[in-house]
Amino acid sequence: MQFFGRLVNTLSSVTNLFSNPFRVKEVSLTDYVSSERVREEGQLILLQNVSNRTWDCVLVSPRNPQSGFRLFQLESEADALVNFQQFSSQLPPFYESSVQVLHVEVLQHLTDLIRNHPSWTVTHLAVELGIRECFHHSRIISCANSTENEEGCTPLHLACRKGDSEILVELVQYCHAQMDVTDNKGETAFHYAVQGDNPQVLQLLGKNASAGLNQVNNQGLTPLHLACKMGKQEMVRVLLLCNARCNIMGPGGFPIHTAMKFSQKGCAEMIISMDSNQIHSKDPRYGASPLHWAKNAEMARMLLKRGCDVDSTSSSGNTALHVAVMRNRFDCVMVLLTYGANAGARGEHGNTPLHLAMSKDNMEMVKALIVFGAEVDTPNDFGETPALIASKISKLITRKALLTLLKTVGADHHFPIIQGVSTEQGSAAATHPLFSLDRTQPPAISLNNLELQDLMPISRARKPAFILSSMRDEKRSHDHLLCLDGGGVKGLVIIQLLIAIEKASGVATKDLFDWVAGTSTGGILALAILHSKSMAYMRGVYFRMKDEVFRGSRPYESGPLEEFLKREFGEHTKMTDVKKPKVMLTGTLSDRQPAELHLFRNYDAPEAVREPRCNQNINLKPPTQPADQLVWRAARSSGAAPTYFRPNGRFLDGGLLANNPTLDAMTEIHEYNQDMIRKGQGNKVKKLSIVVSLGTGKSPQVPVTCVDVFRPSNPWELAKTVFGAKELGKMVVDCCTDPDGRAVDRARAWCEMVGIQYFRLNPQLGSDIMLDEVSDAVLVNALWETEVYIYEHREEFQKLVQLLLSP
């Protein structure tokens, strides 16, 4: 059926072609000997064909008077006279200036143009026809700047829209076409060129100075605005090279704002590269920076990488984070937070981003804001806290879920005395057990605890109850050890724990500990502590780094990871450049069997007094000395996880032998102190008093059905063997790299035996998170579970901080 349908359509098209009265046909004048000449203008003759009862218009060939072209054959005399008058007025400049016109196809195109655009001048027609010789005709030159048509456009406008650079040159050089003439929409030739597909046309226009380059149309858009709106990156580049101005205000701001509004990354980058100040420009309507206009993570990231102020405010006082939350753009929110946006910034009416997020029914966004430091008890100008906003949500399920979310981190509900809230309500709420300020026994977290009266009052969420104001004595009599597990991107959990410790103590991690040991991701964080990088900064770095490093499939390219490490620690920085606190990173020497644990230190290694583990009957290259060891290489060696990254020379990930480096660090400290005593420097030795071990989160325990590997005798047993081998392999890897279990028990027992305070902080995660996880939502949820863990173990944190701050 489709075949017959196409056949019918084809036959219909052919029939119309031959029945078209305006079909141009080459004829001989001898065929019209018996016809009457009705009119004659130049080479055009209108003939009445008596036998056919038609009126034919014939263009006599200037080269051969006996031949010509029939332009139409009409049955109506009136129509024939009208069309003859039109043709006789428009055709002469063409057949007088170029022999190319005297072809059936060209004449057909030209006559169709004349009929379809009766208001066009001969110059407009010449542009569409595209024959250069025609532009030397005096009549065509005389109409070069004519705007007498329905659009009010000049022939130059048409040439630019068509993208015909050769015709453009003819118009400008021979016809002296003006480039600043506007059409009915206020658009110049530059606007038309932008809408075309040939950047060369725009480049030719820009060679001559013209006001049209920066002319605004009736919508207030310059050609640069229009190019940004349409995403014509190459057009933007040419306009900027032609010195188009970036600081002309349009209805939505500068061209950079237009590029951001329509998410045209390439256009925005072009503008910023030409004028870096545009990144800070404010639009006239909202007083918003380009970052406020970012609609996706890619656009926001591009601006922030180029130095855009992440906390710039609009006329209403809102930051870009406020706008991203209001528009429910979670990806933008995450980019802004990871680049250091203030999660507690007060905007219009005193609302923080968390106030706005409560009405969006987006749990991930609420979690992200709180995880990145948003205070849940901050009232706005109306005295409303985020929890009160949540309690006003009309959807009961959403309302309960949000309030339960707050309760998991210690939210208490009560009525503060503020204007507009009755004291009777306040006192009634204060007597409710859920609103009690006594936090010694918080109620169990369950939706069943949320009664109707719990949903109405103004809520005040948790305060860090264990914050201490005392500062530690710089001359401590004992040493403190911090140990950081390996775990890939789950190092974010360690960061969140360290942020809580810093917030509670008011002291940077670097000043709380004398020794820091780390494996893999823990090693990177140990170096970050050594080089005085804040944990809030590192949290953002980790979120940004994962998208750079974990691209493609495993094993990942090492280049992005190495570039990241060089960028953060310096390409030529040595381990011994910073000496306090003492830092050790674990690595696995894989150029020998059995493999050996190696420690990258920022101090000289203690001299060994014990016999070597193996007989050194082979020639092995000694490790690099700390003074010569590059920091970024040490971090790369410690984090060379097999199947994730290729080995760094002879080094594999330290997690193969010490994913929890606590016992190895304590052994190292003991050997270091013994070496100091042997060297007569026993007065410099300090006893270890506190060991803090931070994990990257415990994965949930799951049942394993089969780890049996045997010789199969049938297909069913073969499948069981394959499955068992897979599970067994996973179990072997997990056992080798397990940082919890007996490793923690042994460390705790050792510390208790020698009188050392031991703290193991490692939250239970709800799901198994891979080392190369890139989902923001998954990682934010892991940090949320860490926040819940911190609140539930607040007494342990309080005790730890008190001990760390004691002399």
Curated annotation (Swiss-Prot):
GO terms for molecular function: 1-alkyl-2-acetylglycerophosphocholine esterase activity; calcium-independent phospholipase A2 activity; calmodulin binding; identical protein binding; long-chain fatty acyl-CoA hydrolase activity; lysophospholipase activity; serine hydrolase activity. A motif (DGA/G) lies at residues 653-655. Has two putative calmodulin binding domains, the 1-9-14 and IQ motifs. One calmodulin molecule interacts with PLA2G6 dimer, likely through 1-9-14 motif on each monomer. Binds calmodulin in a calcium-dependent way. The keyword Lipid biosynthesis does not apply. Expressed in neurons of central and peripheral nervous system. Highly expressed in Purkinje cells in cerebellum and dorsal and ventral horn neurons in the spinal cord. Expressed in testis (at protein level). Expressed in skeletal muscle (at protein level). The keyword Transcription regulation does not apply. It holds the Pfam family Ank_2. The active site is at 520 (nucleophile), 653 (proton acceptor). One of its GO terms (cellular component) is mitochondrion. Residues 678-687 are annotated as: Calmodulin-binding (1-9-14 motif). PANTHER family: 85_88 KDA CALCIUM-INDEPENDENT PHOSPHOLIPASE A2, CALCIUM-INDEPENDENT PHOSPHOLIPASE A2. GO terms for biological process: antibacterial humoral response; cardiolipin acyl-chain remodeling; chemotaxis; phosphatidic acid metabolic process; phosphatidylcholine catabolic process; phosphatidylethanolamine catabolic process; platelet activating factor metabolic process; positive regulation of insulin secretion involved in cellular response to glucose stimulus. It is found in: Cytoplasm; Cell membrane; Mitochondrion; Cell projection, Pseudopodium. Inhibited by calcium-activated calmodulin. Activated by ATP. Inhibited by bromoenol lactone (BEL). It catalyses: a 1,2-diacyl-sn-glycero-3-phosphocholine + H2O = a 1-acyl-sn-glycero-3-phosphocholine + a fatty acid + H(+); a 1-O-alkyl-2-acyl-sn-glycero-3-phosphocholine + H2O = a 1-O-alkyl-sn-glycero-3-phosphocholine + a fatty acid + H(+); 1,2-dihexadecanoyl-sn-glycero-3-phosphocholine + H2O = 1-hexadecanoyl-sn-glycero-3-phosphocholine + hexadecanoate + H(+); 1-hexadecanoyl-2-(9Z-octadecenoyl)-sn-glycero-3-phosphocholine + H2O = 1-hexadecanoyl-sn-glycero-3-phosphocholine + (9Z)-octadecenoate + H(+). This is 85/88 kDa calcium-independent phospholipase A2. The chain crosses the membrane at residues 481-501, 512-532. Homodimer formed by catalytic domains tightly interacting through a large hydrophobic interface. The contact area involves 3 alpha helices, several loops and a part of the beta sheet from each monomer. Both active sites of the dimer are in close proximity adopting an open conformation that provide sufficient space for phospholipid access and favoring cooperativity in deacylation-reacylation reactions. Each monomer has 9 ankyrin repeats stacked side-by-side in an elongated structure oriented outwards from the catalytic core. Keywords: ANK repeat, Calmodulin-binding, Cell membrane, Cell projection, Chemotaxis, Cytoplasm, Hydrolase, Lipid metabolism, Membrane, Mitochondrion, Phospholipid metabolism, Phosphoprotein, Repeat, Transmembrane, Transmembrane helix. Residues 482-666 form the PNPLA domain.
